[in-house]
A protein has these predicted regions:
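Bacterial signal peptide processing site
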Residues: 20-22
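Short, solvent-exposed mixed-charge patches
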Residues: 117-119
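A short beta-strand micro-motif
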Residues: 24-38, 74-84
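Short, solvent-exposed interaction modules
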Residues: 70-104
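Second-shell loop/turn segments in exported
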Residues: 39-46, 85-90
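C-terminal motif of bacterial Sec signal peptides marking the signal peptidase cleavage site
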Residues: 15-18
Length: 119
């Protein structure tokens, strides 16, 4: 009986945590914005169109959403190239440390074209 109670309690906590960390809803756009558990933007990638953004969003997880408007308060930037298809993407980050950490190890098919700098 205690096991069932614990499982029910853990399930409820997981559901509440998921709801609390949902980014604001809005119309889709070409800005893929990642947010922390408090809703603050930590990084953003500006894709050439909504379809490209939504493909990446499907792989990115729950902390990222394609938005029509870019996030405010991001202080650093870097330019990345996605191969294929050879698309340049502007990345924006909460600060230079976040930018340098994120771009120090990129997944296969992603290259750093322009290093981190203040916006």
């Amino acid at each position: 009986m205690q096991t069932m109670t614990r499982l029910t309690l853990l399930s409820a906590i997981a559901i509440l945590a998921g709801c609390a960390s949902q980014p604001p809803a809005g119309p889709p756009g070409k800005h893929l914005v990642y947010r922390d558990s408090n809703g603050a933007a930590t990084r953003q990638f500006d894709y050439p169109d909504i379809a490209f953004c939504q493909k990446v969003e499907a792989l990115a997880g729950r902390s990222a959403r394609c938005q029509a408007e870019g996030a405010s308060g991001l202080a650093a930037k870097a330019t990345l190239r996605y191969n294929p298809p050879g698309v340049l993407v502007q990345g924006q980050y909460s600060d230079l440390n976040r930018c340098r950490t994120d771009t120090s190890s990129l997944p296969p098919g992603v290259q750093l074209v322009a290093a981190c700098s203040p916006k």
